[in-house]
Structure formats: C-alpha cells, structure tokens
C-alpha cells in the first residue's frame, strides 16, 4: 500500500517522523513535500496529496499543517477526495468505515506524533463498510463536486434530515 503524505513548513519534522513510522511498518510512502522549514503554503501540499490519491498514484493520503484545518480544506477541493480532519481514533475509523475517507488530516501542533501514528495505522487498517446507506450519503457528498442546480435547492438534504428526525441515525 502506498501512502501519500504532505505538510507545510510548520510541521515538517512531524511529517518526517510519521513518514519514518509508515516506512518502518512496511508501507510505501510518497512524500510530496514540503521538505524543510522554509515558509510555504499548505494548499500546495494538500493539493499534491489529493491529486496523488485521486489519480491512483497513492492508495491513501495524510495531510498535516499546524492546526490541520487549512491543509484539510485544500485537499478536500480535489475531486474524488474525502478527507477527514481528526485527532482521535474514533473519528478516523468512522471516516474510513462509514464515509470511505481516502485522506486523513491532522494538526501537527494539536495532535502529538505518537498518537498521530497510532491513529493513522488504525485508519489504514479500517475497512469501508459498503452498504446502501453509506453509498447513498457518499454519492450525495460526491455530487457536491459538480455545480448542479439541485444543490441550490434548500431541500437538498431534507431526506437525511427527516431520517434524523425519525431517529434513524444513532450517535
């Protein structure tokens, strides 16, 4: 399995540690940068990770910036990417099992590198649970990648809200 990994200059040391961890576990790592502490911008590297995963060059991706918010927003702009910003295993596993997330994002100044490595390993090992409900919500999310008239309809997500109100979703 090949994992694409990218970061901004704030967390290059964390990315290197995570990359070393993944390599030690036997994963191929595609490091898309940045490679030093020279000021740069996280969208560049979020986009690179997203493109590597969306094209099939990598199976999964890891994005890291200071808070994780910026790089995760950037990677999610790449069509075909479903990235989750996480800082715990429960969220990471949920993202993979229910939403078939293919990228995971972290705040390198928020989540310690050892916890990050444990979360990444759990994310990699988790399997997407393919069922009609999960496929339906993923299709709805994916449909947002293209600008379609029905997205402007204030009732676009009503079906899911109605199901929530009926108690069909459990937290």
Curated annotation (Swiss-Prot):
Entry keyword annotation includes ATP-binding: no
Example GO BP: lactose catabolic process via tagatose-6-phosphate
Keywords linked to the UniProt accession: Isomerase, Lactose metabolism
EC number: 5.3.1.26
Pathway: Carbohydrate metabolism; D-galactose 6-phosphate degradation; D-tagatose 6-phosphate from D-galactose 6-phosphate: step 1/1
Matching InterPro entries: LacB, RpiB_LacA_LacB, RpiB_LacA_LacB_sf
Keyword Isomerase: yes
EC class: isomerase
Reaction(s) this enzyme catalyzes, per UniProt: aldehydo-D-galactose 6-phosphate = keto-D-tagatose 6-phosphate
UniProt cross-references to Gene3D superfamilies, sorted A to Z: Sugar-phosphate isomerase, RpiB/LacA/LacB
Gene Ontology molecular function: any one: galactose-6-phosphate isomerase activity
Family (UniProt): Belongs to the LacAB/RpiB family.
Subunit (UniProt): Heteromultimeric protein consisting of LacA and LacB.
NCBIfam families from the UniProt entry: lacB, PRK05571.1, PRK08622.1, PRK12615.1, rpiB_lacA_lacB
Protein name: Galactose-6-phosphate isomerase subunit LacB
UniProt organism field: Clostridium perfringens (strain 13 / Type A)
């Amino acid at each position: 399995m090949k994992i694409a990994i990218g970061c901004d200059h704030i967390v290059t040391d964390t990315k290197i540690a995570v990359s070393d961890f993944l390599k030690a576990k036997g994963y191929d790592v595609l490091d898309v940068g940045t490679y030093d502490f020279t000021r740069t911008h996280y969208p560049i590297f979020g986009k690179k990770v997203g493109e590597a995963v969306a094209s099939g060059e990598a199976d999964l991706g890891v994005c890291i910036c200071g808070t994780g918010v910026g790089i995760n927003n950037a990677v999610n702009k790449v069509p075909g990417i479903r990235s989750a910003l996480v800082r715990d295993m429960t969220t990471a596993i949920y993202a993979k099992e229910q939403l078939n997330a293919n990228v995971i994002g972290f705040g390198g100044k928020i989540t310690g590198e050892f916890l990050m490595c444990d979360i990444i390993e759990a994310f990699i090992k988790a399997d997407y649970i393919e069922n009609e409900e999960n496929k339906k919500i993923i299709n709805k999310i994916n449909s947002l990648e293209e600008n379609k008239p029905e997205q402007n309809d204030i009732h676009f997500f009503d079906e899911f809200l109605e199901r929530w109100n009926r108690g069909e979703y459990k937290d």
